Amino acid sequence: DALPISVLMQFIFTSCATICPLMSATFSHGQNALKEVHNRYRMYSISIDPEYDTPDRLAAYAKRNSASENWTFLTGSRGDIGKVMRAFDVLYQSNNKMYHQPYTFLRAHSDAPWIRIDGFLSVGELVHEFRIALRSMGTA
């Protein structure tokens, strides 16, 4: 039996000079450590600025952050991104992207609930939370 695919996700935008670089650095530096815990995982960074974050800009951002094949950067229409943000309850004050908050979402597998982590995570904390999510679902 193949192990289920786990998901880690965050909302970012490439022109952000405050929290996004820190969040992206955690994913970047955590890639190898996560793979040692559970090699079937995917990371997604979803842009909240689709007008600016073109696929080319996201590809350049991914390269700057040494994104592996497990880490995908997504964009879409403003309406579609809004739907995803509402589904994860990550709306921000006055629809001003500068007010967005650092959230990380984990899901051990497709039948598991999403786990929302508010605030910044170090690489060690990200790996720790990932282990807990996997153990709670009997995946690790």
Regions found by a protein language model. Give the residues of each.
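Short, small-residue-biased leader/transition segments that mark boundaries at the very start
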Residues: 1-3
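Conserved redox-active cysteine motifs that mediate thiol-disulfide chemistry
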Residues: 11-29
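Structural microenvironment flanking redox-active thiols in thiol-disulfide oxidoreductases
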Residues: 23-73, 77-84
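Thiol/selenol-based redox catalytic cores and closely related redox-interacting motifs
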Residues: 67-125
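Alpha-helical elements of the RecA-like P-loop NTPase motor core of helicases
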Residues: 18, 56, 82-83, 124, ...
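Non-globular targeting/processing and membrane-anchoring segments
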Residues: 127-140
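Hydrophobic beta-strand anchors of alpha/beta hydrolase catalytic cores
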Residues: 8-9, 43, 104
